[in-house]
From Swiss-Prot:
GO terms for cellular component: mitochondrion; plastid. GO terms for biological process: cytidine to uridine editing; mitochondrial mRNA modification; mRNA processing. Residues 219-233, 273-303, 327-365, 373-430 have a biased composition (Polar residues). Disruption phenotype: No visible phenotype under normal growth conditions. The keyword Chaperone does not apply. Heterodimers with MORF8/RIP1, MORF1/RIP8 and MORF3/RIP3. Residues 191-204, 714-723 have a biased composition (Basic and acidic residues). Residues 459-474, 682-695 have a biased composition (Low complexity). Residues 1-64 form a transit peptide. Belongs to the MORF family. One of its GO terms (molecular function) is protein dimerization activity. This is Multiple organellar RNA editing factor 4, mitochondrial. The lineage of its organism: Eukaryota, Viridiplantae, Streptophyta, Embryophyta, Tracheophyta. Pfam families: MORF_dom.
């Protein structure tokens, strides 16, 4: 339908490229042209263009519509008969004539162009406009139109068409022999411009329609309904009683919806992507629920069901990032008295109620905080916050890109990046402390940025570890499964939060990767962690000055007690026991997944594998590529001081890079002076390139021969004290 916008758009579209296509030879104009006062959508013309005389647009050539891409000045446009023409004029901006003066100029220009008297010209003019555009509409032939090209002040000559096809009405103020009847004011619509003023609404009212559900008038505890969708880069935020987005009740929403206190449904903000989430939360302060999405789902849909009661509050933040493929993922309920987050099971795998597992096959949808193939997460919250006390799960996140899973009694203040994994599987070498118990990873093809604090990496050709992604196989606590991943750029964070007993305080600046936190740990980790080489090999973890009892172990790979068992190969699961040859410590839940050309004894004993594992294992792929970076960096800003937790790690300035990863396989020890399983207030003994030295406190000795104590040692527990 030809709208009033046709005429306005024809004025707008005279861009330089179109001028070149439709320009004709002409002489310079005696009238000093300046940019005309056109509506907001009008493209401002260049100086060179304005100095040129009017352009006569050939309707047989012009095809482009900047609004729909389908408009053309062909006779199929209603009213475009090449007998009705719109002629716009360019008036000096610094000396703009009055409306009456403009109308007089229109009449004189029409008379001069047609070489007729002023009275005859008034009969030719059927409409004028001095507001949205400056010009007049007159009836004439194509041959007569040619005469207007060189007239002073004439800007565009365009065939006119109906703005109201049903009533066959042209736009502008109606002009009948000098008598002017104001016409309808054009208003913007999603299709262009509407000419009927009665259908127009103020911009503020339209904005409210976009951002506010129809049931805005209801009370905060009774908000139900659906609203309009907004653009992907917009947000809809509603504040109620001074509290932003605190929901006390249950809600169902699609996209990014922040409701008030009570029950509600809404789609006030929808980032492309389709999912639904439901949840319940009984909280002293409420539960913060946020759904985030990035790329749209091509096939498949994720449904999430969570029930997380907490003593003081629940934080449930989801980021639906399905990769482009097929699949479905469902989540079972996971009650927790301490705010444990339950983030999904994939493809119908069943796990005990105290477990959280991710198992993602090739091409299946990725669970929350999982970065799939090329998926990118928009940035959200930036600043860290402080939260309450006791059995309290809190979550503070910068712009995440990856997977984040949290459980109870943890405090993290992380910085930097760690464990880059390539797009087609790879070997991971976590930083020291990466193997806190009760976690497992199961990865399909590809890799992601993974936190070095948790174990059980299973990366290979889609073969999960036992208990990591197989139906009916339980994992002790948590499992991850990743699809085709994308490299994540490094970031920086601002450490901050300080929590207390049984307090999950996760303070993450702009993290980009997958992070799993487990119980009873305090971590203040900085810098970069280990990176795997392009081809297979055995690599020791970066040393972050953490507390690991026991004597030095062998040479080559030095893995500490209560940490990790490493499995490399092509994803064939193999359950094994990890036993320390010196202290006799056995692995509670470790997995030996061995592949091509790599021989690891069943008991994990020998000079090449001095491995002690408690509840974690790694399963790695063969021939993976990863950036050849080095790990073991410690940042300057300490954080994460807690009470009643099992350990407190504080790192400071990086000194010497450690754990370099090379292009080909091989056995590598931990950083200089950090071989074996050292304990605090002990000498660090090592072999080969490692040296032995004595320190009073090795909490901050990651690749450094100095003793980097925290700013205030009284604020941290002695790392050599056991809980």
């Amino acid at each position: 339908m030809a709208m009033f916008s046709h005429r306005l758009r024809r004025i707008v579209v005279a861009a330089p490229s179109y001028f070149q296509r439709f320009s004709t030879l002409s002489r310079p104009s005696d009238f000093t042209p300046v940019p005309s006062l056109l509506p907001r959508s009008v493209v401002k013309q260049s100086t060179a263009i304005n100095r040129s005389p009017a352009r006569l647009f050939s309707t047989t050539q012009y095809q482009y519509d900047p609004y729909t891409g389908e408009d053309s000045f062909m006779p199929d446009n209603e009213g475009c008969d090449f007998n009705h023409w719109l002629i716009t004029m360019n008036f000096p901006k610094d000396n703009l004539p009055s409306r009456e003066e403009m109308i007089s100029i229109f009449e004189q220009t029409c008379a001069k162009g047609l070489a007729i008297s002023l009275e005859e010209a008034k009969k030719k003019i059927y409409a004028i406009c001095t507001t949205s555009y400056q010009g007049f509409q007159a009836t004439m032939t194509i041959g007569e139109v040619e005469k207007f090209r060189d007239l002073p002040g004439v800007q565009y000559i365009i065939p006119d068409s109906y703005i109201d096809v049903e009533n066959k009405v042209y736009g502008g103020d109606k002009y009948e022999n000098g008598v002017i009847t104001p016409g309808p004011v054009p208003v913007p619509t999603k299709e262009g411009f509407d000419s009927l003023k009665k259908e127009s609404k103020p911009e503020q009212e339209e904005a409210e329609i976009i951002l506010t559900p129809p049931d805005e008038g209801k009370t905060s505890g009774q908000v139900q309904g659906q609203g309009s969708l907004t653009l992907p880069d917009q947000r809809s935020v509603k504040e109620r009683q001074g509290t932003l987005a605190l929901v006390q009740g249950q809600g169902q929403r699609s996209g990014m919806s922040i409701l008030g206190q009570g029950q509600g449904e809404g789609r006030r903000m929808s980032i492309p992507g389709q999912w639904q989430s439901r949840g319940q939360g009984n909280s002293f302060q409420g539960s913060f629920k946020q759904s985030q999405g990035t790329l749209p789902v091509r096939k498949g849909q994720t449904q999430i069901s969570d029930e997380i009661p907490s003593f003081q509050g629940n934080v449930k933040q989801r980021q639906e990032m399905p990769i482009h493929g097929q699949g479905q993922a469902q989540r079972s309920q996971m009650p927790s008295s301490q705010g444990t987050l339950r983030q999904g099971q994939a493809q119908g795998s069943q796990r005990p109620s105290n477990q959280v597992g991710y198992n993602q096959g090739q091409g299946a949808q990725t669970p929350p905080y999982h970065q799939g193939q090329g998926a990118q997460t928009p940035p959200y919250q930036e600043s860290p916050n402080n939260y309450g006390q006791g059995a309290f799960v809190q979550y503070n996140q910068g712009p995440p890109q990856g997977n984040v899973v949290q459980t109870t009694q943890e405090k993290y203040n992380q910085m930097g990046q760690g464990n880059y994994a390539p797009q087609s599987g790879g070997n991971y070498s976590p930083a020291q402390g990466a193997g806190s118990p009760r976690f497992g990873y199961g990865q399909g093809q590809g890799g992601q940025l993974l936190s070095p604090y948790r174990g059980n990496y299973n990366q290979g050709q889609g073969t999960p570890l036992p208990g990591q992604g197989q139906e009916g196989q339980p994992s002790y606590q948590m499992g991850f499964s990743q699809g085709l991943g994308a490299p994540v750029p490094p970031n920086q964070v601002i450490p901050g939060n300080y929590g207390q007993w049984a307090f999950v305080n996760y303070n993450q600046g702009p993290p980009q990767g997958n992070f799993l936190q487990g119980p009873q740990q305090n971590h203040n980790q900085g810098g970069q962690w280990n990176y795997s080489p392009q081809n297979g090999g055995h690599y020791g973890p970066a040393q972050f000055g953490q507390w690991y009892p026991g004597p030095p172990q062998g040479q080559g790979i030095q893995w500490p007690q209560y940490q990790l068992s490493y499995n490399q190969g092509q994803g064939t699961p193999f359950s094994g026991q990890c036993r320390c040859p010196n202290c006799g410590m056995t692995s509670y839940q470790g997995y030996n997944n061995q592949g091509q050309g790599t021989h690891i004894p069943e008991q994990w004993e020998g000079q090449d594998y001095a491995v002690l594992s408690y509840q974690a294992s790694y399963n790695q792929a063969h021939g993976a590529q990863a950036p050849p970076y080095h790990g073991n960096y410690n940042q300057a800003t300490p954080g994460g001081y807690g009470q009643g937790t099992s350990a407190n790690f504080n790192q400071r300035f990086p000194v010497n890079p450690a754990n370099y990863n090379m292009q080909n396989g091989g056995n590598y020890g931990p950083p200089h002076g950090l071989a074996g399983n050292p304990g605090f207030r002990q000498g660090f003994s090592g072999q080969g390139q490692n040296q032995t030295f004595q320190q009073d406190d090795q909490r901050n000795v990651a690749g450094d021969l100095r003793n980097n104590n925290p700013v205030d040692p009284t604020e941290t527990r002695k790392p050599n004290s056991r809980i």
